[in-house]
Amino acid sequence: MKEDIAVKVQKQLFELQDLKYRDFHAKLMPTIDKEKVIGVRTPALRSYAKQFGKTEEAKEFMKVLPHKYYEENNLHGMLLEQIKDYDELIIELEKFLPYIDNWATCDLLSLRIVKKNLEDFLEKINKYIKSDQPYTIRFGISMLMKHYLDDNFKIEYANKVAAVQSEEYYVNMMRAWYFATALAKQYDSIIPFIEEKKLDVWTHNKACLLYTSPS
């Protein structure tokens, strides 16, 4: 049953294939073998996910890990977005996180439902950023950037990101994005990280490069 649904989904995704898009998009993800990219444009995949998510087969598909294709992982992420129960979401999310193998799938996840559970989710983030999996760490930092930089901001969150130590490019790139975004949203609180050189040189320089002053 599990194998059958995977084959069925793959067939349907190939029906949405755009080879020119595949060739272009694959170049943006050097960690992914081009043969693992089908080439489905995001709007088409979201439309498919919206309909597929209404079926019982969607639950079966989410049990089939690891997935073979990049788009299957993105579909999985889009299905997570449709889960309305927070506790169920966390269970399914933590099954999926270890299998994320690229920045695009990682950053696709926004999980708006966590906005109603920010205190509890913060405990999960603390665990994610201490992971030995680079994309789990990146995901944790991205959640701090997406959900904890406005009214919910506390300087301790920025300290957590600053304390992350990694040699992984895609972890450090997200750290830089975090501080660039934080400068735009919480300038007075974040500028000391730059002025006092609290970040490693690479992250400091990249964050400054990415930062666009709100003025």
Predicted segments, located by residue:
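Non-membrane alpha-helical segments in proteins
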Residues: 43, 47, 70-83, 96, ...
